[in-house]
Structures are given as C-alpha cells and as structure tokens.
Amino acid sequence: MSADCEGNSTCPANSTEEDPPVGMEGQGSLKLVFTVLSAVMVGLVMFSFGCSVESRKLWLHLRRPWGIAVGLLCQFGLMPLTAYLLAIGFGLKPFQAIAVLIMGSCPGGTVSNVLTFWVDGDMDLSISMTTCSTVAALGMMPLCLYVYTRSWTLPQSLTIPYQSIGITLVSLVVPVASGIYVNYRWPKQATFILKVGAAVGGMLLLVVAVTGVVLAKGWNIDVTLLVISCIFPLVGHVMGFLLAFLTHQSWQRCRTISIETGAQNIQLCIAMMQLSFSAEYLVQLLNFALAYGLFQVLHGLLIVAAYQAYKRRQKSQYRRQHPECQDISSEKQPRETSAFLDKGAEAAVTLGLEQHHRTAELTSHVPSCE
C-alpha cells in the first residue's frame, strides 16, 4: 500500500514535532467534547444496556450466530465495498480515498447500541455484534485496507491502532459483563438502571448532534467529503437492512443489523488517521470523521423518530379497532421489545431460520393493548 498522496505530495506518518496547521487550533474544544462524551457514553450506557442482556440469550446467540454472521458480513463486507465505490465514484484524491476506506473498515460503535434500544431492536444481538466486530477488526481492518487501497498508492504503510482497539474492547466487555451480573442478581434494579442509561444515552446523542452542528461552521472540509459523510451512513443502514431481510432475519433483527451497519466507531477511525497521516492532511480528514459521526447521529435520531411515530400510529389504530383495550390498565412491558418478540428471537436461535420466519409471521399478528 504505497504511492503518491496528491500528485507529487506524500503522506508521511504523523509526527509529534510538527506544529498543527492552520485550522487545527480551533479543534481542541471539539475533540475534548467528543472525547469526554464518548467516554461517558461507553461507560454508563454499555453498563446500563448490559442490564438488559440475559446470559442465556447471549449464549444462544453465540452458539448459533446467524444474526452475528450477517452483521459481520455487512460490517466488513458491505461497508468497505461501499467506501471503495464512493471513493471511485466521486473521484477522490488518494489521501481522501484512504480516509473513506478507513472509515468503512472500522467496526461498529457504541452509538448503535443506543439507537437499537430506541427502535426496539435485539439488544443481545446488538451488543454481541459490537463486541464481535471489534474483535474481528484486529484482523479484518488490515485485510480490508490491503484489498481496497491497492487502487491508490501511499509512500508509507497505514498503521492499525491496535492499542485503541484493545481499549475499546475493555470499555465494552467490562461494563456489559457488570450489567449482565447486575441483571442476574438484581433484576428489578437492573430495569431501573436500563431506563436511566437509555435516557442518558439519548440525551448524550442530542448533545453530540447539537454540539456538532454549532461547531461545524468552522470546519475545514472538502465539499465532496462532506457529501460522502452524509450519504455513507445512510447507504450502510439501507444495505444492512436489505441483506438482513434477504437472509430471512426477523424484523427486529433487520432493524438491529441496519443500525449496526451504518454506525461506525469514529474514535478508532480518528486514531488510525492520526497514526497514518501528517498534520497537513489531518485538517480535512479529521473533520471528515467528525462529520460522519455527526451525520450518523442525525440519521439515527431521524430513524428513531420515524419508528416511534409509526409505532404510536399502529397502536392508536389498533385501539380504535378494539375499544376494549381502552379499559385495560396494562402494566408496562419490559423495554426490550414485547414478550412475543423475545420468544421469536429465541426461536430464531433454537429452531433455525425457516422455522423462525414462520414463528415471526405468526407472532407478529398477536394483538396487544400496550
């Protein structure tokens, strides 16, 4: 993986002795905001979502990993290929194309777990996919970059941020394992922690979105990269949903895989860019990564809003057709989908894909006054 970055220019490895170029001075506050929010989100949100995971269901996912396999195919098959096609289609410069490929080769991020919760996705599958994709990134990131960057040349090999990947793994596994233990020992307290964590995670996403919009005025980014950062996560969501649908996953899993596919780990992408490019190019490339992170949050919030609106509309229509539901003071079901969806998801792992489809089709018509 070596050649020219921009005509006769080169992309030497990042040097700590170089002064930041013009335009980077104002990024300190932005980097600090995203770093702090990411740390809080990874710690608190993953612990709270771990409280929604049952060890038995998690083990079933790992024993028969149909959903995880489809998710990994989307993550390290569709996303790098999409990045390559976007780079070719938009005629990007070599260093810009490499940055887009780095983003497409990254594993899923924590944002996907928050969004999955709010679209009633399969949290066990979501957390399993995030963890497994991070582990797989140790080998798949260099493989994908080796395959797709051969169309361009760099004067120096790209550097995989193995330390950052290790830190990400620890920040995922430890809080989730703690949450699973809390759910096993104190299920009532775990439900409360889950609600608090989901609310905090949602607010953090809003803060990230607002902060990004406010600070985006000073971003120095190529218009083409800005357009790609907007459409790339959308393409990931759509392609992930279609592949999950074509492989006969349940609607719940289709939503989960769709969210997981489009939401990338921005921190790993930034870490790799800092290790692989000089400060001369980091101005545009870091802003591309931040823009992608902003758009994936904005797209995710729109998806959540659309799903919640659809859910309320369906519930309202059902209640109008069944007035007896108005007289039922129903208790709140567990936040992670309804009971019949949980049974359907378990059936998917136990019975196989075809039986699960029949189960899902039957249970999807179960009336509910919730």
Swiss-Prot record:
Glycans are attached at residues 8, 14. Keywords: Glycoprotein, Ion transport, Lipid transport, Membrane, Sodium, Sodium transport, Symport, Transmembrane, Transmembrane helix, Transport. Glycosylated. It is found in: Membrane. GO terms for biological process: bile acid and bile salt transport; sodium-dependent organic anion transport. Residues 1-24 are annotated as: Disordered. It holds the Pfam family SBF. GO terms for molecular function: bile acid:sodium symporter activity; sodium-dependent organic anion transmembrane transporter activity. Residues 54-67, 119-126, 181-195, 246-265, 306-370 are cytoplasmic. It catalyses: estrone 3-sulfate(out) + 2 Na(+)(out) = estrone 3-sulfate(in) + 2 Na(+)(in); 17beta-estradiol 3-sulfate(out) + 2 Na(+)(out) = 17beta-estradiol 3-sulfate(in) + 2 Na(+)(in); dehydroepiandrosterone 3-sulfate(out) + 2 Na(+)(out) = dehydroepiandrosterone 3-sulfate(in) + 2 Na(+)(in); androst-5-ene-diol 3-sulfate(out) + 2 Na(+)(out) = androst-5-ene-diol 3-sulfate(in) + 2 Na(+)(in). GO terms for cellular component: membrane. The chain crosses the membrane at residues 33-53, 68-88, 98-118, 127-147, 160-180, 196-216, 225-245, 266-283, 285-305. It comes from the Eukaryota. It is a multi-pass membrane protein. Highly expressed in heart, lung, spleen and adrenal gland. Moderately expressed in skeletal muscle, testis and small intestine. Residues 1-32, 89-97, 148-159, 217-224, 284 are extracellular. InterPro entries: BilAc:Na_symport/Acr3, Bilac:Na_transpt, Na+/solute_symporter_sf. The keyword Aminoacyl-tRNA synthetase does not apply. The keyword Kinase does not apply. Belongs to the bile acid:sodium symporter (BASS) (TC 2.A.28) family. In humans, 3-beta-sulfooxy-androst-5-en-17-one (DHEAS) is the most abundant circulating steroid sulfate in the human body, it is mainly synthesized from adrenal glands and gonads, whereas rats and mice have low circulating concentrations of DHEAS in the periphery as they can only produce DHEAS in their gonads. Transports sulfoconjugated steroid hormones from the extracellular compartment into the cytosol in a sodium-dependent manner without hydrolysis. Steroid sulfate hormones are commonly considered to be biologically inactive metabolites, that may be activated by steroid sulfatases into free steroids. May play an important role by delivering sulfoconjugated steroids to specific target cells in reproductive organs. May play a role transporting the estriol precursor 16alpha-hydroxydehydroepiandrosterone 3-sulfate (16a-OH-DHEAS) at the fetal blood vessel endothelium. This is Sodium-dependent organic anion transporter. It comes from Rattus norvegicus. The gene is Slc10a6.
